[in-house]
């Protein structure tokens, strides 16, 4: 927990970015969090995420547009994303001098977005899901189509059932969480200390990037 894994992650990430023709320092990133259940070993900073109905900790990630981890922060699951972004990005200016643009989800609206813009001078774009149609909207659309066609209308054609939705830019960080969770140690948060959890995030990414570099 002396920062070795974080430094290895940064060195390998920069090498992969240069290999793909990019600047070693990113100018844009994507932020999201994942709530993970903790085990019975005890430890610091545990809490309950009311939205996900999970008791444990959150893994907060900032990734580049390739999904490579720039910053990782582990904290109590009860900390809302609007506050967690401050914990995640507190060293962003020191480590990522070119960073200027962020994509986030709707959980960061309000004070989280405002803090990143004012304190760090970042441009922050909130990526929204497609709006769910209200009953009134469904009824109006059905009546309009019925009047136009003079026959019954299939509502599933007007409003397809919503399943998994790939969100622009946001899918990149979701894929990173999937990469990390391929490691059995990351299926839950087994650690007593948040710093140990952060080290395992970086270690998982180091493993992935070493394999990529070894293939070439």
List PLM regions with ranges.
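Short alpha-helical elements
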Residues: 1-216
């Amino acid at each position: 927990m002396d920062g070795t894994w974080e430094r290895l992650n940064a060195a390998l990430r920069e090498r992969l970015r240069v290999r793909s023709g990019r600047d070693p320092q990113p100018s844009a990133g994507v932020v999201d969090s994942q709530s993970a259940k903790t085990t019975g070993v005890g430890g610091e900073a545990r809490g309950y995420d009311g939205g996900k109905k999970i008791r444990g900790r959150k893994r907060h990630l900032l990734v580049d547009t390739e999904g490579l981890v720039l910053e990782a922060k582990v904290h109590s699951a009860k900390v809302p994303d609007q506050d967690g972004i401050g914990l995640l990005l507190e060293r962003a200016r020191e480590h990522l001098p070119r960073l200027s643009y962020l994509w986030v989800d709707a959980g960061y609206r309000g004070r989280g977005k405002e803090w990143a813009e004012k304190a760090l001078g970042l441009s922050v774009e909130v990526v929204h899901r497609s709006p769910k149609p209200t009953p009134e909207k469904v009824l109006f659309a059905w009546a309009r189509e019925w009047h136009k066609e003079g026959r019954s209308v299939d509502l599933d054609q007007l409003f397809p059932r919503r399943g998994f939705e790939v969100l622009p830019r946001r899918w990149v960080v979701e894929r990173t969480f999937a990469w990390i969770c391929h490691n059995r140690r990351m299926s839950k948060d087994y650690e007593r200390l948040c710093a140990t959890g952060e080290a395992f995030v970086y270690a998982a990414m180091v493993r992935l990037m070493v394999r990529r570099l070894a293939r070439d």
